[in-house]
Amino acid sequence: MAHKKGQGSTRNGRDSHSKRLGIKEFSGEVVKAGHILLRQRGTKFKPGKNVGMGRDFTLYSLVHGQVEWDGSRRLVHVKPFNTA
């Protein structure tokens, strides 16, 4: 008989890396074209005016302007600055 217990294996020790989802630019913030506004899984929020949606449902700005969130309809808009 063994005097010491053999080393068993554990069933723990695994975890996935966080995906860094969520809102990146809030209402009133100034963004340039191409800035990421939101990372999400699925279409929890939908793109509004001057906002594009990537293949992984990421919302990004299409123009230089100010971010506007429409909370009631879950839309994100970017209000462009007037260029004279």
From Swiss-Prot:
GO terms for cellular component: ribonucleoprotein complex; ribosome. The keyword Cell division does not apply. PROSITE patterns: RIBOSOMAL_L27. It comes from the Bacteria. InterPro entries: Ribosomal_bL27, Ribosomal_bL27_CS. NCBIfam families: L27. GO terms for biological process: translation. One of its GO terms (molecular function) is structural constituent of ribosome. Belongs to the bacterial ribosomal protein bL27 family. Residues 1-21 are annotated as: Disordered. The keyword Ribonucleoprotein applies. The lineage of its organism: Bacteria, Pseudomonadati, Verrucomicrobiota, Methylacidiphilae, Methylacidiphilales. Keywords: Ribonucleoprotein, Ribosomal protein. This is Large ribosomal subunit protein bL27. Residues 12-21 have a biased composition (Basic and acidic residues). The gene is rpmA. It comes from Methylacidiphilum infernorum (isolate V4) (Methylokorus infernorum (strain V4)).
